[in-house]
């Protein structure tokens, strides 16, 4: 199955913390890099057979990746991925920003042109990609 989701990263399940409705899954990326945290339904965990040590693909829509120009503290967002901007494609309303992180991987973020200009995001800039755990999907 082909997907339109730009951010697709392979890893192994490091931990599964079950809840009544939602389950928190920590994914360790193949080849190293930061762990990703996903909050998915308990039903999805059962249906996909997600277990510690099992292979999964982390899926994140580019529109769900926010950017910060400095480390962020005092925030509930679990996935804070430091990286370096490798490319910026700016349009009239939105911009696509590619961020290199951990072992040659990239995340793609789509932000408003206004945010791009306010933050001064440009190629070579250090940024932190921010993704809520509830915005991370998993595939097996």
Predicted feature residues:
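Glycine/charge-rich catalytic "coupling/switch" loops of P-loop NTPases
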Residues: 2-17, 21, 34-35, 42-95, ...
């Amino acid at each position: 199955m082909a997907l339109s989701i730009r951010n697709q990263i392979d890893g192994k399940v490091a931990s599964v913390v079950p809840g009544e409705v939602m389950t928190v899954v920590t994914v360790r990326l193949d080849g190293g890099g930061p762990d990703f945290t996903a909050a998915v339904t308990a039903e999805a965990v059962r249906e996909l057979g997600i277990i510690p040590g099992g292979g999964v693909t982390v899926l994140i829509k580019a529109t769900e990746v926010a950017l910060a120009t400095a480390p962020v503290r005092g925030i509930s967002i679990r996935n804070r991925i430091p990286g370096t901007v490798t490319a910026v494609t700016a349009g009239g309303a939105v911009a696509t920003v590619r961020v290199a992180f951990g072992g040659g991987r990239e995340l793609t973020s789509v932000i408003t042109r206004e945010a791009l200009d306010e933050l001064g995001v440009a190629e070579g800039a250090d940024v932190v990609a921010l993704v809520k755990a509830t915005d991370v999907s998993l595939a097996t």
